[in-house]
Amino acid sequence: MLYNEPSPLETRVLTRRFGMPNSASLDTYLATDGYQAFEKAAGMTPEQIIEEVKISNLRGRGGAGFPTGMKWSFVPRKSPLPKYIVVNADESEPGTCKDRLLMEYDPHQLIEGALIAGLAVDSHAGYIYIRGEYRYQIDIMDKAIAEAYAHGYLGKNIRGKRFDFELYTHTGAGAYECGEESALLESLEGKRGIPRIRPPFPAVVGAFQCPTVLNNVETYCAVPPIIRDGGAAFAALGVPKAGGTKLTCLTGHVNRPGVYELKLGFPVKTMIEEVGGGILDGKKLKAFIPGGSSCPVLTGAECEGLTMDYDSMAKAKSMLGSGGVVVMHEDTCMVKAALRIMRFYAHESCGWCIPCREGTSWLRKLLQRFHDGMGQRSDIALIGDLAKNMLGKTFCPLGDAAALPTISIVEKFYHEFEDHLHGRPCPYEEAGRLAPV
């Protein structure tokens, strides 16, 4: 997805350099307050840096929403082992495409965030694990890292601050599973990308069995403005328990899809109607995925009064997730939507856990049966039963990611499965108004 023109309703903190000439260059970054946060952080104690991040109420932007400052504080202060900073840039969630833009248009912001994290936990080496399909972004990050080394922002005795930090890119091989933090670490170490048993967690036993800070690209990019302008200023942009802005990938049946930076707590309806330019052809909102394909699906009615933040989504029994919003209008076949989602998860299951490996395969086959007009009434209950028996029974969240949207679609759009029973064609397709999903 190309970068879209900004909306006047955006609050551009992490994306403020987007659209500037040569925005990825070090010269542009330095001309717009770049690396000033690192200079400030270098004069702070590790405890002060972590406390500022805690004050900001920054929560992980990769999907889980765990408080970042708390996560950093779990890293042991004194350890005989080296500590590592790892950036999760393995962005593979359907509907999510924000991290690629942050790396493409402002790579030095990510580098500075990783540097400050290194100061906070006394780490001197970091890895950016980038999705293998992001060849262009990998080249941009490598160029930015080379610029940072050439101008003394990486390497030995950075800017005379008596702080050393080495940073490397590591390319993934296209596995969605490696977006899960422990599978990512296994892959980083050259092993098969499958999840680890936890505890211990990466903060104590992470990369190469050493203490590790592991966060998402957007999370690290939020750190420089937090340190530069203060945690309280960042916190004020959001809601009480979650500070700042969130990059939202607005996709689906809207007139103006794109990546937008919005304050946490932004109204869903305003996002769709004003930021996204409304629903295609003036149709009604039927279904809404708030944070990527792994989130429970909400109906149009459930979006009334809903805001884009962690607590609001939890009350609606969904998740903010990674911010991959998918809007579906009234001509969407929800059976087909469920099948598209399940095809992805069945393909991407690493096969390590039987409930996920077998469950996603069976769900895909059952949904395909309905899509082909061969479903039976008993199959509807079987789909729900299979999905519910996957919840909480796998080493990583992929099993839940496949089950949650399926359960919500079956429960909320039960009648559409009935419409596909006993050889009946899809009513939307038959009427010639089937929307693409």
Each PLM stretch: what is its role?
Residues 64, 70-72, 96-99, 138-143, ...:
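Short acidic, glycine/serine/threonine-rich loops at helix termini
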Residues 29-34, 88-99, 202-207, 249-254:
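Gly-rich Lys/Arg/Thr-decorated short loops/hinges at beta-loop-alpha junctions or inter-strand turns
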Residues 138-264, 276:
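Hydrophobic alpha-helical positions that pack around
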Residues 1-52:
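Cofactor-/ligand-binding subdomain signature composed of acidic, glycine-rich
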Residues 36-52, 81-83, 89, 98-103, ...:
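Ferredoxin-type iron-sulfur electron-transfer modules in oxidoreductases and energy-metabolism complexes
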Residues 113-117, 264-282:
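Short amphipathic, charge-patterned alpha-helical segments
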Residues 106-120:
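Histidine-anchored nucleotide/phosphate-binding helix
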Residues 55-74, 117, 174-186, 190-191, ...:
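Conserved phosphate/anionic-ligand binding catalytic regions in large, soluble enzymes, centered on
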